Each structure stands twice: as structure tokens, then as C-alpha cells.
Amino acid sequence: RSTSLLLSENIKQRLDRFDVEKPFDVMAVIDGSTLPNKMPLVDVQATIKNSNLSTTIGEFTNASLKAHFSNQVNLSEQRSDANSRFTFTGCSAIWEKIPLKSDSFNIANLEHPIMDCDLHTAFELAQLNELLGASTIEFKNGHCNADIKYHGVVMKSDTAPASIFGTVNLDNAAIEYTPRNLTFTDCSGSLVFDDKDFIVKQLKAHSGSTSLLMNGSVKNLTSLIDKSPEKLILNLNISSPKIVLSDFISFLSKRVITPAADAKKNSTKKLLKLATQVDKILNDCSVELQINADRLIYKKFNADKVAATLLLTDKMVALKNVLVAHAGGTLQLNGSLTEGPVQNMVRLAARMTNVDVTKTLTAFDNFGQDGIVDKNLKGRLSADINISGLINTKAELDPNSLRGIVDLRIKDGELINFEPVKKISQTAFKNRDFSNIRFADLTDKLEITGSEIKVNRMEIQSSVLTMFVEGIYDVEKGTDLEIQIPLSNLSKRGEDFELKNKGVKSKTGMSINLRARTGEDGKAKITWDPFKHALKKKEKEVRDDKSPANSIKVIRKK
């Protein structure tokens, strides 16, 4: 402190915030008048060896450095704070058990201080947990080494953006993202600071049985980190030989936001601010993922050649341009998952093209119904699907919440031991085998409301007979379907019969009308329906839905 008396009052006040435990060597040159309003040339050199330093950012132990101060860096300009500079070389110390080294550390222009420094360190990542007390991220294990160069302002009042260059290397790290209870293990790779940008380079990680390789960036990190962290976007390209979706099921749970824990007691407000910034960035920033995977697995579902874009915000996961190869065909998908208080809202627009319908039913567990299952149906399915519903944290769909439309087409189709169709032979055409029937292209628009599926008039040209089906299929409340069988079916069909659709509006002539309804035992019953009760019931429900009274009710609900 006695040395600081040689300096101007402004600089002295700043230096007096620092304290050196042991005596150290100082050489000072003062040249010029020390009278009021005069400023002599001041040139000070100091050497500190293996001492402890007390600073505004904590205690540094076993510190060694060489320091130099001059108040006339540019000899052609007057001596002043603006023309002053501190230079530190050969710096080494231990801060909060973390070893630090710096080859060069300069602070110039003490009116509006600008810092230029390099920093080298290596430590165990778990040391950061107690030090920072961040609530969004926890380091379980792993090693870190960093080489950083910084150029920027020191004072809060100076708003010029900082430039950071350098690399942080992670080795065998385990990192938990606590809001989603998601842990990444075996993390190795580089985090690169490139001026204002932050770059993720060749970062390898595992989550469960999924291995990931990540490359990406955050643009303008240093510009937005304080002012608008919500504008930060982490763009990541992720590749994987196999993604197991169940490893990421925690994304269906509500994000848990907890206040930051207190940083280590002897840490400073600056560390608390850093922890708060880390939490705010991870909570507020958006993440855009470009995903490419050789294989995707979820329970019984398997897909190959996976390409997808995911946008993650604090309340939503958006799916864009998802394309996978599945069951010999393709599946395209766009949609969103929006976090709700209890369940999450899912909205999907999908297109299936030429997939094996048996494999697809198996993969999706028969879509939660047991009316027609994978063992009953063969063929190639193409479909346009627009659907919404609620999903819980276990990825289980609430069937009563489903709303949507499915436009489907099945080529080369076969019905195998489908009980409702087999029962037709108990009522009509008793001498025909309904256990295995082939049919022409099957097309229809299905309207889904909860467990109810409205089947619009559908033509089935099969190897056994022609029939037209329409009505309601409902595994919970009961099925009620109208089955029209034209009498042109009276002649049996041979192996060479051409399966060709005539159209749902084609003339059918005289017909037999049957009704398929769910009985009290829960099984389908086929009965004669000469007066078309099933169809009349359906038409009445349509009229009721379109009635003015119902329209008024809808308006009032809004």
C-alpha cells in the first residue's frame, strides 16, 4: 500500500482494493514535479513470488507475477490516466483450488479501462458446482483445460462488446441438465470462443444407449448475453448411428425451474452474477437441432435414414421436415409438442408413403385399438394424417383427446381372419370363405373424435364380394356400421377376378343391407338392416351437428 502512494489518487484507490500478504520487490522511477496540478512521470516495476493476493474477485494463493506500471505509455502524449497502463507477465496462482496461468495481462487507458489477457487453466469440472451454484447444469465428473484470450472493457459503465478467443477442451465429462433431468456422459470435445461467437466442435456424448456427435454455434453470444439472452439461438448439427427416443423421454415432463443455489460462501457477487447468467441463458435461449441418424428406435418402432429439424424453446418442441424410412416406405412429419400444466398438447401433420401396413401397426402398437390389428391386415399403406391430442410424461396418448382426419389408401390389401367380416357369412353368403380375402385399392377419409372413428362411405372390392361400408367405429362407446352388399355378388368370384373399384357413388342396384354393431358382450354382431337404421342414425347425427342450436352453442363457447 505504501507503493500506491506514488500514484495518482484515482489509481491509488483502485490498487488499494488489492492486498499482498508477503513483502515484494518494487522499483519506482518518479521524474518531474509533484506539486499540485503537476503529474510527474511514474514508472513502477514489481515482482511478487509465492504470495497470497486478496482481490475483488476472491483470494489467490501461491501467486507469482511481474508487474509494470507507466503513466506515459505513449511518449508523444501527456501523462494521464488515459495514457497509463498496467502490464503483468509470468502470472501464476491458485484461485478456489483452480490453477491459473497468464503469460500476458494488460490493462490500458485507466479512464475507460481495456483489458487484454490470456488465461490457461486445467481442473476437474465438479469443482465448478460449489463455486458457481448454477441451478440448470451440474457437472458430475470429467476434466477441463482451457486456453482463452480476452479483449474488452472492465467497467460496467463501458458497453463496448468484448472479444473472446480460445478453446475449452472437455474430457470424459458427465453433465446433467437439471430442468429436464437429462444426463450426458462420456462428453469429450471442444468449446471454441471465436470473437463474439461460441462454437461447439466435435463434441461426443452419450445419453443412455444413444451416442451423439455434435457441432454447432451460438452467434453474437457476447453481444446478447447481458442484453437479450432470449434472442440467443444454439444451432447444433447432431449425428448418431442410433437414437433411442426413450433416452429423451424426460422432454415430455414439465421443465423444472429452480432458483440458483448460493455459490460458495467466499465467492463474490461477480460469481453469483455468472451463475445467474448461465441459468438465464440455458432457460431463455432457443435450441435448433439438425438431426441425422442411421437408425431411430422407440419401443417397437424402427426407422432408418432419419433426418429432422427440432426447435426447442422453454415451452415447446417443434418438429420440422422430419423424414424417415420406415417399413419399406417413408414417413414425413411436421408438428409440435406444447407443454401443459398436466399433459402436453401434440399436433402432427404426417404423410406415410407405401409403408407395410402390418409392420406399421406393429410399430405403433395397433394405435391403441384392438379392432383391426397387425395380424389381420396386409398391404401397402399411404396416408395423410392431421391429428392432435394430449400426451402424458410417459409418452402415452389420451385416446379421448384425439381429434383429426386421416386420408388413407391401402394397395395390395388382404384381410386375414378379421372377425367382423367373417361374421358376415353367418348372416349372408354362408358358403363363402371370409377368412382370407384380397381387396382392390382401399381409400377413405376417417374422421377421428376421441375414441370414435367416423368411416365415410368406403368401397371394398374384394376377392369374395363387393361391399360398401360407412358409419361409426368406436372401441369404447360401441361400433355402428352400415354394410351394403349389392346382389351382383351372388355369383362366386374365381382366382382370375379383377379387383377394380367402381367408385363409392357408382350404381349398385338391388342390395342386401347389414348392420355391424357392438353387442353387450363387447363383440361385433352382424344383423339384417333392410331399413338402413345405421345409416339413418348417422344422417340424423350429421343434421344435429349442423342445426342452428348447435351453432349457437359453439358461438357462445367462444
Residue ranges and their predicted role:
Residues 1-93, 98-196, 210-438, 465, ...:
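Membrane-proximal interfacial segments on either side of biological membranes
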Residues 439-446, 451:
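Generic long, charged, amphipathic alpha-helical segments
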